[in-house]
Amino acid sequence: MDKFRRNGKEDTFRQRRFLYPLLFQENLYAIAYDHYLSRSSSFESMENSSYNDRFSFLTVKRLISRIRQQNGSIVSFGNYNQNKNKLVGHNRNFYSELVLEGLTVVLEVTFSIQSKHYLEGMNEWNSFRSIHSIFPFMEDKIPHSNFLLDIRIPHSTHPEILVRTFRYWIQDAPSLHSLRSVLHEHRNLILSENLDQLILIASKEKTRLSLFLWNYYVYECESLLVPLWKRFSYSRSLSYGAFLERTTFYRKIEHIVIFSHKSIKDLKKRIWFLKDPSIHYVKDRERFLIALRGTYLLVKKWRYHLTNFWQCHFHLRSQPYRISIDELSKNCFSFLGYLFSVQMKTFVVKIKMLDDSFITDPITKEFDPIAPTTLLIGYLAKERFCDISGRPTGRLAWTGLTDDNILHRFDRIWRNILHYYSGSSKKDGLYRMKYILRLPCAKTLACKHKSAIRVVRERFGSELFTKSSPKERELISLSFSKTRSQRERIWHSDILQRNPFCNSWRNKQNLQVETPFDR
């Protein structure tokens, strides 16, 4: 890919942005074929592996000649009745996939060059791969905020809208017509028919191009909104004249800022906002969380402007229900499988002076992450480890496994739950999860050996989860310790994948966001 990027002459991309000639280079389709082969080897059966014998540079030259003969479209393989005569002796799916991969390589190379300047400005941000790395940031910043905007990115858009956004950095008309043809022929790349998947791409059609389109869609949102938030956050305060009452002056000066910009007639206009020096933003897939410190009027203005942003920039209909407002002091919110709330804590402080001493009780805000016990029980019930009320049941399907395999499976499920929810401030729910998993493990072993649960416990011991390493046992003891110094939240730096429960919970929440009008 780097060699192709060097041979493509980056200066030509920056000055002219002509992409269509790249579609006639043989090296491009060699790269595309390599991507297609690696993906097909993972997801397709061995019957379709005969594509190895079909690829040759002679085939590529024939494909390029077919592309040259196309009128207004590179890809017209969607209608088999119109193209079966053209593709005699060749697999039309192979041609279609190869052209799609080739177009994706061109877009990825050009997009990486175009976004280099934007990405250079983000190098100063600390980047961590672990999912838990975002929680210390939220723990440090969100308690200083008053309101939270919970935003769901609109999950579908018209193909022509994406073509219009690509016109900002693709200037040659043939490339735009080619992209328009691909998006209209393969609408399943951008329109999800599955209501459980409220994102830009359908789960069964996750191609390299569909992932690129989703990332570009999110990039467009962030590249326009993040600079606006930075400008608003770093804005200067307004200098007032003399006020009769200095207390009122300081209260007003703290919450008011001014923006100055030139209009079409080069006239300066002043737009007044309530100042918000605390704007924090996190994202997970199709979901944005924006924490604000200010009044309810300010938050309503932000929701109004964000709704207009999607309506004007992406030509989507107004969807204010996708942006909910939560007051952090009264409501809790969910994110990445956790339930979060901001609790008001009071503590007694004794201040001793030379001649006197007094006691005060200051109020502080504490970030409180909680493992959702009820929803975890619902997930375990769905996996048939217990019923909906939390009563454990055995896994009869596992009775054909060995004892070590059964113990290992239950132990792995328990360790995954404990590892992911080690940052929970309340461990009672994790105690219950451990009990729910221990009893099904004993019931499964008892059913396999046709004995009682008491006999199984006497044979394997009261602690059925015996596969944990010494370090993991030490971590478990620290997580459930009763001393205050050892009850601190533990965030791990090695969690690279979401807990399966998070995905099921996210799908359930997305279904609740949907309205009959969308369906």
UniProtKB/Swiss-Prot annotation:
GO terms for cellular component: chloroplast. It is found in: Plastid, Chloroplast. GO terms for molecular function: RNA binding. Transmembrane segments: none annotated. It holds the Pfam family MatK_N. InterPro entries: Domain_X, Maturase_MatK, Maturase_MatK_N. Keywords: Chloroplast, mRNA processing, Plastid, RNA-binding, tRNA processing. GO terms for biological process: mRNA processing; RNA splicing; tRNA processing. Usually encoded in the trnK tRNA gene intron. Probably assists in splicing its own and other chloroplast group II introns. Belongs to the intron maturase 2 family. MatK subfamily. This is Maturase K. It comes from Cycas panzhihuaensis (Dukou cycad).
